[in-house]
């Protein structure tokens, strides 16, 4: 993969500001986002995670970047034990109210997850908000919360190795080799 040249290495303060700006975007548009994405069909992504899980469920699943809880509710309805995680307080409140599941209020750059707690981690269209310079560290944090033989599913919008703001929302759009 070609190295991104658009955003230079960021300081910890610049990372904090970038992260806060993106979360603030979702805070301001949480209800509109929930409505706009309610009917998105991600069943093939959910099935991809579940068919690769070992053993017999129900599974402990972390929905990383759960937003308003659409996929969290699907996992619960399927009989699993999902926990959500989102950096946006409005999404956390919406997801808790909608699903009655535990939802952690954490952002990707400051994860504090229990070691080996999950059979699976589902990150659907969320980790593209992690700056590429932090991605390896964040992936290591995710790996540490997975049980032995745990499954990590990640889906992100593709791009041409660019990091940019779309309005006030940061995204890293990577080319797949």
Predicted regions: what is each one?
Residues 58, 64, 123-126:
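A general, composition-driven signal for non-globular sequence regions
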